[in-house]
């Protein structure tokens, strides 16, 4: 069903528009001063009223991220790929979503350590998740998106990794403005990587989740009459 392809697109649009709206609010009400340098995303969402919008944007984004991660995991399994990598990838996707929610609910001005832990899950673990998805793209058949989707995911994952390293280096050198720019670009890349799942989800029509019940005899499975068409 082609409608599933809208889910990753909705996440990309929602998250991208949301954090830039938060940025606009923080600049317009003077919560951040651009003359001091370009602000980090978290700084823009620290103070009210934009902190309320920031939390809501990231909470909804986290929910959509969980939904997408689970569907992608099941899609890969339905294609006959039962690799451990797929299971680990699901765990990474869920941790990324958890970190995103933590960032939105624990502002750096109140709970800095918790906020940084959430940022690590959202950015670093999120980057690892998409590296795993890049590998799975080459493992799974059929390959949706032709010969382009794999290289695109690879290039975006490389760029994301490089920018995370640069963000940490510039922050260590006290070049906060440049570090913040790197952070914003990383966020945009991660949103784009989520949006690319629309290529895979476009082909979800015809796949089924079967509710199965174990029988008393090992290795025999009785399939129930309940079939969920996605």
Swiss-Prot record:
It is found in: Cell membrane; Endosome membrane; Cytoplasmic vesicle, Autophagosome membrane. It is a multi-pass membrane protein. GO terms for biological process: autophagy. Glycans are attached at residues 29, 33. GO terms for cellular component: autophagosome membrane; endosome membrane; plasma membrane. The keyword Protein transport does not apply. The chain crosses the membrane at residues 2-22, 51-71, 84-104, 116-136, 151-171, 184-204. Its main location: membrane. Residues 1, 72-83, 137-150, 205-230 are cytoplasmic. Keywords: Autophagy, Cell membrane, Cytoplasmic vesicle, Endosome, Glycoprotein, Membrane, Transmembrane, Transmembrane helix. Residues 23-50, 105-115, 172-183 are extracellular. The keyword Protease does not apply. Modulator of macroautophagy that causes accumulation of autophagosomes under basal conditions and enhances autophagic flux. Represses cell death and promotes long-term clonogenic survival of cells grown in the absence of glucose in a macroautophagy-independent manner. May have some role in extracellular matrix engulfment or growth factor receptor recycling, both of which can modulate cell survival. Belongs to the DRAM/TMEM150 family. This is Modulator of macroautophagy TMEM150B. It comes from Xenopus tropicalis.
């Amino acid at each position: 069903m082609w409608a599933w392809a809208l889910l990753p697109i909705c996440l990309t649009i929602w998250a991208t528009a949301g954090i830039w709206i938060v940025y606009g609010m923080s600049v317009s009400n003077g919560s951040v001063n651009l003359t001091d340098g370009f602000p980090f995303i978290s700084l823009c969402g620290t103070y009210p009223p934009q902190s309320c919008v920031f939390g809501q944007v990231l909470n909804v984004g986290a929910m959509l991220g969980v939904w997408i991660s689970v569907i992608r995991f099941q899609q890969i399994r339905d294609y006959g790929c039962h690799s451990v990598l797929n299971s680990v990838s699901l765990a990474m996707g869920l941790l990324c979503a958890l970190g995103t929610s933590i960032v939105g609910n624990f502002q750096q001005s109140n709970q800095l350590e918790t906020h940084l832990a959430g940022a690590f899950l959202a950015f670093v673990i999120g980057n690892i998740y998409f590296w795993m998805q890049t590998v799975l793209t080459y493992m799974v058949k059929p390959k949706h998106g032709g010969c382009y989707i794999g290289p695109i995911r690879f290039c975006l994952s490389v760029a994301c990794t490089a920018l995370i390293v640069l963000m940490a280096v510039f922050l260590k050198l006290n070049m906060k403005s440049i570090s913040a720019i790197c952070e914003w670009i990383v966020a945009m890349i991660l949103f784009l990587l989520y949006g690319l799942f629309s290529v895979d989800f476009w082909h979800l029509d015809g796949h089924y989740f079967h509710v199965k019940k174990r029988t008393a005899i090992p290795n025999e499975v009785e399939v129930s009459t309940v079939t969920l068409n996605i």
